[in-house]
């Protein structure tokens, strides 16, 4: 594999050919290029140079701008595949791969994997492995690297979230505190954001799998070979590029039984198998997040039940205190009545009346309190 070199002149020439002389050039961005021969180069090119090199429009290139917020997207164009998968922003053609911001910490593992996967087969490899390598087009090998990288990245983030969330939720159920509640709140916010990112990647893969025409657009090598040789291997004309709707009605079972030199234009089985593998992987990641969300919801329900129980206990305490207050108020009422400085004759020479008043009033108030509590228990207003 050739060492990486900085090619600034090539980028400048491409930019001059793409833009008008009086127009302002776009800001240069760092790209790394891998070609089918296994060589890699670092390009410091502006957007006009990239647009001219891979033949895409400015709208497609804008999707790869890290300063703009675009959802995960896989676009098939005439000569390129535009990939925006989280931090992986790449353009794949039939002969080369351009990866943006190769020095980013999250992109470096992708660069290493592309360097390993796209290297030419060595002579020491088994013939079977070499044959399998040759069967897969260059753009599919590059696409597989990016899909594997993004699925592994999101899977790792999900695993990290699970390892932090489950202990925090268990701790919250055992002890409800402001610190634990704030910790779970932050974890739930992170889970919601991660769930949206995983869901978008999954939806993009599902959308591709549901549309055979979109998958056929990703066969860049086939389109390139068809443009160079418009006649199929059987000698007949190739009608499929002119009538894609007819080709989309052919069943997948019949596609494999009618190959041409460059492959049936409607045979998307190879790409379908590739996408299905990573669709299942990202779907498994989404299922983990769904399970975590359900666990969080169950924990919230459990905490709400605990809070309701504490609230009921406070209501019971309030009932006891209110009942006691009413009884004491009646007792105070009797004491207030007899404490008034009003002359009445029946109190003369009857000192024992004080004892009876105090005793009867106290017993009556106690009986009244017990009656209120017994009635509340009978109606189920307080626990047994």
UniProtKB/Swiss-Prot annotation:
Compartment annotation: Membrane
Recorded GO CC terms: membrane
Record GO biological process: magnesium ion transport
Domain of life per record: Eukaryota
Keyword Transit peptide on entry: no
CDD domains: Mrs2_Mfm1p-like (cd12823)
Bilayer topology annotation: Multi-pass membrane protein
Family statement drawn from the similarity comment of this UniProt entry: Belongs to the CorA metal ion transporter (MIT) (TC 1.A.35.5) family.
Described function: Magnesium transporter that may mediate the influx of magnesium.
Protein name: Magnesium transporter MRS2-I
Organism: Oryza sativa subsp. japonica (Rice)
Lineage, opening ranks: Eukaryota, Viridiplantae, Streptophyta, Embryophyta, Tracheophyta
Encoding gene (name): MRS2-I
């Amino acid at each position: 594999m050739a060492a990486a070199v900085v090619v600034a002149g090539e980028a400048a020439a491409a930019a001059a050919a793409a833009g008008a002389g009086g127009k302002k050039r776009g800001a240069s961005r760092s790209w790394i290029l891998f070609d089918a021969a296994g060589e890699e180069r670092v390009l410091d090119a502006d957007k006009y140079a990239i647009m001219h090199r891979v033949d895409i429009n400015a709208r497609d290139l804008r999707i790869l701008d890290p300063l703009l917020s675009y959802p995960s997207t896989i676009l098939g164009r005439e000569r390129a595949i535009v990939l925006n998968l989280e931090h992986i922003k790449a353009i794949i053609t039939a002969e080369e791969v351009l990866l943006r911001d190769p020095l980013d910490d999250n992109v470096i593992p992708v660069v290493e994997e592309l360097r390993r996967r796209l290297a030419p087969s060595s002579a020491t490899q088994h013939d079977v492995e070499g044959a399998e390598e040759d069967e897969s087009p260059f753009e599919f090998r590059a696409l597989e690297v990016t899909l594997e990288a993004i699925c592994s990245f999101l899977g790792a983030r999900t695993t990290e979230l699970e390892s932090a969330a489950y202990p925090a939720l268990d701790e919250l159920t055992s002890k409800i505190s402001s610190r634990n509640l704030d910790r779970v709140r932050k974890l739930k916010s992170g889970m919601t954001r991660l769930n949206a990112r995983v869901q978008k990647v999954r939806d993009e893969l599902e959308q591709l799998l549901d549309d055979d025409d979109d998958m056929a657009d990703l066969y860049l090598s086939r389109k390139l070979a068809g443009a160079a040789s418009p006649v199929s291997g059987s000698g007949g004309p190739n009608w499929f590029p002119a009538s894609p709707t007819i080709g989309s009605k052919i069943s997948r079972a019949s596609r494999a039984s009618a190959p041409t030199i460059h492959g049936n234009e409607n045979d998307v089985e190879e790409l379908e198998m590739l996408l299905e593998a990573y669709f299942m992987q990202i779907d498994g990641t989404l299922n983990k997040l769904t399970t975590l969300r359900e666990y969080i919801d169950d924990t919230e329900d459990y905490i709400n039940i605990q809070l309701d129980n504490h609230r009921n206990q406070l209501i019971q305490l309030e009932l006891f205190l209110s009942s006691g207050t009413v009884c004491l108020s009646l007792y105070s009422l009797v004491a207030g009545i007899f404490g008034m400085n009003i002359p009445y004759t029946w109190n003369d020479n009857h000192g024992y009346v004080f004892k009876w008043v105090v005793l009867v009033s106290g017993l009556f108030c106690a009986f009244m309190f017990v009656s209120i509590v017994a009635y509340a228990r009978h109606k189920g207003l307080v626990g047994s």
